[in-house]
Every structure is written in structure tokens, then in C-alpha cells.
Amino acid sequence: MKVLVIIALCLVAFQSALSKKIENFESYIEDLKSEARECIPLYNDCTAFKYNNNCCKDPEKKYQYKCSCIVCKEGKEQCTCQRKETVESMMKCVRFVKKVGEKVIEKVG
């Protein structure tokens, strides 16, 4: 009997801790989204070229660059030249966080 009570208390504690973690995780994702939508002044703006990477050539041919675009809160698009590896890593991270968030919400909801 004591074991069942202890298990029940552990489950209740675990559930409340998990719900707090999920709330924190959801707010963290929202913070990331709003942060990503904030536009900043650009030094290597390639918006006029969109995804045409001619504006992102490296004269020393040391790195490959991509024109990466986001849509800001105002609906305005902003594009910058970034290293290809950075853009690809960022996209993998975004997809991973999105999948984890969906799975957590699916399990809870």
C-alpha cells in the first residue's frame, strides 16, 4: 500500500514538473519565433536578388554563401548573405525544434 502511495505521489510530482517544462518550452519556442521575425539593419542585403546567389559570391572563394530570407513581423521580407553551412545547420535546427514541439504538444494535448 505504501509503495502505491509513493508511486502515485511520484507520478503527480512528475506530471506537474513536466507541465511546467512544456509551458517553458512553448514560451521558449514563441520567443525564438518572435526573435527571428525582428528585422535588423543589413550590411549584406540581397533582398533584390532573392534566392539568386550572385550577390553572395566570396571573392577569395573560401566559403560558399546563400541568400537566406525571413519574413519580419510587418510582413516585410529581409534577406542576407550567409555561409551555406550556417544556413543549412539553422534549417536543420528549426526543423528539429518544430518536430519536438509538435510531439510534446501531441503527447500532452
From Swiss-Prot:
Among its keywords, does the record have Aminoacyl-tRNA synthetase? no
Residue ranges annotated as propeptide are 20-37
Post-translation changes: Contains 5 disulfide bonds.
Q: Keyword set for this entry?
A: Amidation, Disulfide bond, Knottin, Neurotoxin, Secreted, Signal, Toxin
Free-text function comment from the UniProt entry: Insect toxin. Causes paralysis in larvae of C.vicina by depolarizing membranes at the neuromuscular junction.
| Localization, UniProt | Secreted
| Name the record gives this protein | Latartoxin-2a
In Gene Ontology terms, what is one molecular function of this protein? toxin activity
User: Can you supply one Gene Ontology CC term for this chain's record?
Assistant: extracellular region
- Which cysteines in this chain are paired by disulphide bridges? C39-C56, C46-C67, C55-C81, C69-C79, C72-C93
Which residue positions does Valine amide occur at?
Answer: V108
Notes concerning its domains:
The presence of a 'disulfide through disulfide knot' structurally defines this protein as a knottin.
Q: Which family does it belong to?
A: Belongs to the neurotoxin 19 (CSTX) family. 11 (latartoxin) subfamily.
Q: In which tissues is it expressed?
A: Expressed by the venom gland.
Superkingdom is Eukaryota
- Native species of this protein? Lachesana tarabaevi (Spider)
Highest classification ranks of the organism = Eukaryota, Metazoa, Ecdysozoa, Arthropoda, Chelicerata
Residue positions of motif Processing quadruplet motif? 34-37
Where does the signal peptide begin and end? Answer: 1-19
Keyword Chloroplast among UniProt keywords: no
